[in-house]
Amino acid sequence: MTTIAVVGATGQVGQVMRTLLEERNFPADTVRFFASPRSAGRKIEFRGTEIEVEDITQATEESLKDIDVALFSAGGTASKQYAPLFAAAGATVVDNSSAWRKDDEVPLIVSEVNPSDKDSLVKGIIANPNCTTMAAMPVLKPLHDAAGLVKLHVSSYQAVSGSGLAGVETLAKQVAAVGDHNVEFVHDGQAADAGDVGPYVSPIAYNVLPFAGNLVDDGTFETDEEQKLRNESRKILGLPDLKVSGTCVRVPVFTGHTLTIHAEFDKAITVDQAQEILGAASGVKLVDVPTPLAAAGIDESLVGRIRQDSTVDDNRGLVLVVSGDNLRKGAALNTIQIAELLVK
């Protein structure tokens, strides 16, 4: 008898988790949903029955003792407070926030890349990577295995859903506010008022913001999204000295993160070799031109536009473009795939 819990079940990623649990026929006899007091008491249809959402603030170790796996997507603050409680009650927690990713005693797992790390549990918690890192890892791991990855230069073009529901609502409202005046931006960037900037530094509608995430106050002038890309890539690939430089850009796309990756390797690797490797890689789909619209709603990371990097000698550099659904594989799906590994 397996019992699974979804914490943050009514949120943006939680909704996708519920859908995927049904689609994948996850082997659970009992499912419990948790959310904040604001959403507690709601009834959600799941597998033909209605399940009442429980108030996470009322949870106790005793009330949680039947749970085997808990999928968390309730934000870092809630995870820090409640994930240890679920773990103490006997559950293995798979957390989608950034709360535990840098903890040396918490494995950071991409199901296709380092699944065996699930056996190294100290705190009863497994961390899910950031959605941008997630898109890249199934692509980079098999290339690393073939040629030895030594350096990454990455630019990411991240959808507004990566900022949560506030990002989605902000873009939709700004597009509506500008309306038919949008073509006036051709000659004047101030031609129309997009309204409230929401969670961003400037209007996102009809714009590109080279500032995704929050500025880290450590003198590097990097955002937390850019540092996550470096730190998480090193941890997942087991390459603590991997050189990673990233610029994370927010773009007016609802779902789907796209990355341009300049990868340098220890050994030569040609475009033909890379295509052959990636064509056989798990969690990867080889296409001519990856786009966020094409990636939205599918499980795989799309990879294409593969070229030799002419700035790296001896055919040791590749340029690739990757697109991935930041809500699906970038968050919900990988969490569930980890849970599937746990209950096998």
From Swiss-Prot:
EC number(s) on file:
1.2.1.11
> Which reactions fall under this protein's catalytic activity?
L-aspartate 4-semialdehyde + phosphate + NADP(+) = 4-phospho-L-aspartate + NADPH + H(+)
Q: Which Pfam families match?
A: Semialdhyde_dh, Semialdhyde_dhC
Question: What is the top-level taxon of the source organism?
Answer: Bacteria
Q: In which pathway does this enzyme or protein participate?
A: Amino-acid biosynthesis; L-lysine biosynthesis via DAP pathway; (S)-tetrahydrodipicolinate from L-aspartate: step 2/4; Amino-acid biosynthesis; L-methionine biosynthesis via de novo pathway; L-homoserine from L-aspartate: step 2/3; Amino-acid biosynthesis; L-threonine biosynthesis; L-threonine from L-aspartate: step 2/5
Q: Which UniProt keywords apply?
A: Amino-acid biosynthesis, Diaminopimelate biosynthesis, Lysine biosynthesis, Methionine biosynthesis, NADP, Oxidoreductase, Threonine biosynthesis
Return the InterPro entries for the record: Asp-semialdehyde_DH_CS, Asp_semialdehyde_DH, Asp_semialdehyde_DH_beta, NAD(P)-bd_dom_sf, Semialdehyde_DH_NAD-bd, Semialdhyde_DH_dimer_dom
Residues reported in the UniProt entry to bind NADP(+)? T10, G11, Q12, V13, R38, S39, S161, G162, N326
Q: Which residues form the active site?
A: C131 (acyl-thioester intermediate), H257 (proton acceptor)
Q: Which residues bind phosphate?
A: R101, K228
Q: Where does substrate bind?
A: Q158, R250
Please provide, alphabetically and separated by semicolons, the GO molecular function terms listed in this UniProt record.
aspartate-semialdehyde dehydrogenase activity; NAD binding; NADP binding; protein dimerization activity
Note the SUPFAM superfamilies from the entry: Glyceraldehyde-3-phosphate dehydrogenase-like, C-terminal domain, NAD(P)-binding Rossmann-fold domains
Q: Name one GO biological process term.
A: 'de novo' L-methionine biosynthetic process
What does the subunit section of this Swiss-Prot or TrEMBL entry state?
A: Homodimer.
Q: Which PANTHER family match?
A: ASPARTATE-SEMIALDEHYDE DEHYDROGENASE, DEHYDROGENASE, PUTATIVE-RELATED
Give the function comment from the record.
Catalyzes the NADPH-dependent formation of L-aspartate-semialdehyde (L-ASA) by the reductive dephosphorylation of L-aspartyl-4-phosphate.
Family from the record: Belongs to the aspartate-semialdehyde dehydrogenase family.
The entry's protein name is Aspartate-semialdehyde dehydrogenase
Underlying gene: asd
